[in-house]
């Protein structure tokens, strides 16, 4: 291209030496574009790796940077829209759609470095839940994640990662299910079974609930966007009525019940009463 063509207002200038006709529509598109101007020895890491592995991203939005990492004996990447890191020799690297990406287990540990500025405790548990459910690290202490964390020497965010590791559970099917579970745990509720069967009056299958407290036959169900169409709402209402017919109580949980303090308090009180819990012993906030 000529110098004049390179200065065309129709070209997107992503970074030094990189122009494109179309603005990248995703983190993966941006990473693929940057791969043309980055050294061959780098790998995408931290929140960028999280997005490339299709792991849950921070609920309040990630910083608009590409995280890139290389070995400790190489200069840190310094480039517009990039956050450079070192230490790649201590991590596993995978290839995803021709991109070098830090492994998913190491990525979870690396996210601890971004706590609390860009990643919350709930974010760390959500990513951990996704990893153990997708890759089958279902031991009670999640040995693969624990092993990767154990190999780190005084990692930034290490205490928070250790606490998050103890809160990770096999069986959660979505980030918002994880956040709903953590909401009840923080309030002091007994731990429910995850995505568990609830039986009908004859002992047969009645429904599978997101969070199930067996003793009192109480179920909490997170209702995401797939439950918004009228047909889905009709099905959910019938499901709750059938559950009640068989002596089970089903509580619907929406995002506002998790993130809005007033809605959260009211939901926690309702479920606590259904479980015959002493409100004075709970942290309803």
Where in the sequence are the language-model features?
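Surface segments flanking catalytic/ligand-binding clefts of nucleic-acid enzymes
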Residues: 132-285
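Short gly/ser-rich loop at a beta-strand->alpha-helix junction or flexible surface loop bordering the NTP-binding
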Residues: 1-156, 277-285
């Amino acid at each position: 291209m000529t110098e004049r063509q390179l200065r065309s207002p129709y070209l997107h200038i992503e970074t030094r030496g990189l122009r494109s006709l179309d603005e990248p529509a995703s983190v993966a598109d941006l990473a693929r574009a940057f791969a043309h101007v980055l050294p061959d020895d780098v790998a995408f890491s931290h929140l960028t790796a999280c997005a490339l592995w299709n792991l849950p991203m921070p609920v309040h939005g990630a910083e608009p940077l590409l995280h890139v990492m290389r070995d400790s004996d190489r200069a840190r990447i310094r480039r517009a829209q990039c956050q450079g890191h070192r230490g790649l020799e201590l991590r596993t690297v995978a290839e995803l759609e021709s991109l070098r990406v830090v492994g998913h287990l190491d990525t979870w540990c690396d996210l601890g470095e971004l706590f609390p500025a860009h990643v919350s405790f709930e974010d760390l548990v959500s990513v951990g839940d996704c990893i153990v459910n997708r890759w089958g690290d279902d031991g009670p202490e999640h040995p693969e994640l624990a092993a990767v964390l154990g190999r780190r020497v005084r990692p930034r965010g290490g205490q928070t990662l250790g606490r998050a590791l103890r809160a990770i559970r096999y069986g959660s099917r979505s980030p918002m299910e994880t956040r709903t579970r953590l909401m009840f745990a923080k309030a002091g509720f007994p731990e429910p079974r995850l995505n568990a069967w609830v039986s009908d009056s004859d002992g047969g299958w009645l429904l599978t609930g997101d969070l199930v407290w067996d003793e009192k036959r109480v179920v909490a169900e997170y209702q995401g966007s797939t439950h918004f169409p009228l047909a889905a709402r009709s099905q959910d209402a019938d499901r709750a009525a059938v559950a009640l017919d068989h002596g089970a109580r089903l509580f619907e949980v929406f995002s506002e019940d998790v993130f809005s303090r007033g809605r959260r308090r009211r939901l926690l009180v309702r479920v606590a009463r259904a479980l015959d819990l002493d409100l004075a012993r709970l942290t309803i906030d």
